[in-house]
UniProtKB/Swiss-Prot annotation:
Residues 24-154 form the FZ domain. The gene is fslP. It comes from Dictyostelium discoideum. Belongs to the G-protein coupled receptor Fz/Smo family. This is Frizzled and smoothened-like protein P. Glycans are attached at N43, N61, N96, N101, N152, N180, N232, N288. It is found in: Membrane. Residues 539-552 have a biased composition (Low complexity).
Length: 587
């Protein structure tokens, strides 16, 4: 259906002159120009030129049409060329008549293509004729009711009151010259002939028509793709660095990993893994292209399968652990803790592995014209929805729910005990959750925009294809819509790891973790750097659980004394999952 829509666009542009419903008489017999594309395809030399028509313009129009027939099929093309030549350059018959006053008058008449010739072309070209070449239908008629493709002959009547009344019967033209070259499809560069390049059993070829495929690489946004790639690489590198820092801080250095730390650690791991898939692709030019001309990589190309699995696993990991972070924040704002965290852990990781492996079993990991190796849905299948979008929407729904509930709890907390420090920390976490929610929502919503604009994309490709069929491809530029949204999508996806760093990586507790890390102290001691790099001494207070402001013992003690008046902010706990509350932090 996509190929059909594409052809409708380009043929409607070029076949306007064929759609004339008038047969104009009073024309002239002209020699078929050697520059005519039909010069070698007709067995006569004179054709009927309608009054007002130009031979030069006629030659150009027919040449453009024949070039566009490269987008049809080997069965249709030669028959369509033959029919178009007979219709555009009808054989001219001259009738010389003598009037009653002994004056001679000449009548030039066209010999129209026979219906039998039309039927030969109609069968292989039926889909094209029915949809956009209706005037080439064998039942078509001129505006005066005369058949365009007569069965045997056409009657022409000329009357002049009191002077003459002539009737002429002109037999139809059944000329057929088979040209072997006419059946060869010559796809205009940079398109490739599917007959020469499509390998049986291989997939991920993109057909423009039944005979022509896109070459690889193919840029939807020419001249802008490199800008997107560089932006994506830069932002992803920043995100990777911040995620790596979060992994060190909450997964390697802590003396004890709490539930909140594990959630942040899992999210950061997902960000690093997602970035890794981009780094693998960036090591190879035109990564999406296979070694076979015109074929985009599919799951049979192991590197494409690997990057697809890595990206899917990393993206789903970050998406699934984002609501867990929000849930932990919501529970903490209620001065409680998560029960049965181990069950959540098992459930989330199991679902992540299943959703990553499922498309692989269906053979759906492949590159496309617009995306790198991931789940391919060009065939309209539901693999992307089942394996990514629906689970992601569920996760985003939970993220939204817990963010709203957290806002309510924080507002109640502030109303009872106003504290700007607590409010600032809570607002920072809430804003981080909202940014994550926006990023994930925008990234998933872009799919619906792209699908809604699919016809617009094919219109743009149609204009581009018309251009390359006429002349130098380097002068033809594809103007596809949606570049701004595509660029914004690159940004929002690339900064996911950086967002979680802003929310949790800049908390004062991070400094505390690094200072109190026994692993870091051991490394410094082994390297002989412990005398040069002094870490803070480990506190013996069992109530040092907030850590959201200040790092000295005096500040922590002051914080404990004030705990009955105002609960501290739900920051990242270094010893347990309960912040200091009105029981002085005792659990």
């Amino acid at each position: 259906m996509k190929k059909l829509n594409f052809l409708i666009c380009i043929i409607n542009i070029l076949f306007l002159f064929v759609n004339s419903q008038d047969l104009k008489l009073g024309g002239s017999c002209e020699l078929i120009d050697s520059n005519s594309p039909c010069f070698s395809k007709l067995n006569y030399t004179d054709f009927y030129l309608q009054p007002g028509d130009s031979i030069t313009q006629l030659n150009k129009n027919v040449s453009d049409i024949i070039r566009m027939l490269e987008f049809t099929t080997p069965e249709c093309k030669p028959n369509a060329i033959n029919l178009i030549c007979l219709k555009s350059y009808p054989k001219c018959e001259t009738h010389n008549e003598t009037l009653s006053n002994n004056t001679n008058i000449i009548f030039n008449l066209p010999s129209l293509p026979c219906n039998s010739i039309c039927l030969i072309a109609e069968t292989p070209c039926k889909i094209f004729i029915d949809n956009f070449l209706k005037d080439l239908s064998c039942s078509s008629k001129f505006s005066n009711g005369v058949p365009m493709f007569p069965i045997n002959s056409t009657d022409f009547e000329f009357k002049e009151s009191g002077n003459f009344d002539f009737n002429f019967n002109v037999e139809c033209n059944d000329n057929i010259i088979y040209d072997n070259s006419s059946s060869v499809i010559n796809c205009p560069a940079p398109l490739l002939n599917s007959k020469d390049h499509v390998i049986p059993g291989k997939t991920t070829y993109y057909y423009i028509t039944d005979s022509c495929i896109l070459d690889c690489p193919f840029e939807i946004y020419p001249g802008k793709t490199k800008i997107l790639d560089k932006t994506n690489y830069t932002l992803t590198s920043i995100s990777f660095i911040t995620c790596f820092f979060m992994i060190l801080t909450f997964g390697v250095l802590p003396n004890k990993i709490t539930h909140r730390m594990e959630s942040i650690l899992s999210f950061a791991c997902g960000g690093c893994i997602t970035a890794l898939s981009l780094f693998i692709q960036s090591r190879q030019d035109n990564f999406n292209c296979s070694s076979d001309p015109g074929r985009f990589k599919s799951q049979s190309d192991y590197l494409c399968l690997l990057t697809g699995l890595i990206f899917q696993f990393g993206a789903i990991t970050s998406i699934f652990w984002a609501p867990m972070i929000a849930y932990d924040f919501y529970i903490t704002s209620r001065l409680s803790k998560i029960r049965k965290f181990g069950l959540y852990r098992i459930g989330i990781w199991s679902l992540i592995f299943v959703l990553t492996a499922l498309p692989a079993f269906g053979g759906k990991y492949s590159a496309t014209v617009a995306t790198s190796c991931w789940i391919n849905s060009d065939d309209g299948s539901a693999w992307q929805y089942i394996s990514f979008y629906i689970p992601s929407w569920c996760a985003m729904g939970l993220l939204c729910l817990f963010s709203i509930l957290s806002v309510i709890n924080v507002s109640k907390m502030y109303m009872k005990s106003p504290n700007r420090r607590i409010l600032f920390f809570n607002i920072k976490i809430i804003i981080t959750s909202l940014i994550l929610l926006f990023n994930l929502t925008f990234a998933s919503s872009l799919k619906f925009y792209m699908e809604d604009k699919m016809d617009t994309y094919f219109d743009a490709i149609a204009v581009w294809a018309e251009c390359i069929s006429k002349g130098d491809p380097s002068q033809c530029e594809l103007h596809a819509p949606g570049y701004e949204l595509k660029a914004l999508n690159v940004v929002v996806v690339s900064i996911l790891g950086f967002c979680i760093f802003i929310g949790y990586g800049l908390d004062p507790i991070v400094i505390q973790i690094w200072k109190e890390s026994e692993k870091l102290k051991w490394i410094l001691k082994k390297c002989g750097l412990n005398d040069f790099i002094k870490l803070g001494s480990e506190t013996t207070s069992t109530t040092n659980t907030s850590g959201s402001s200040g790092s000295g013992s005096e500040k922590r003690q002051s914080k404990i004394r004030m705990s009955k008046l105002s609960p501290p902010p739900p920051s990242i706990d270094t010893t347990n999952d309960i912040p200091i509350n009105d029981t002085l932090g005792e659990n």
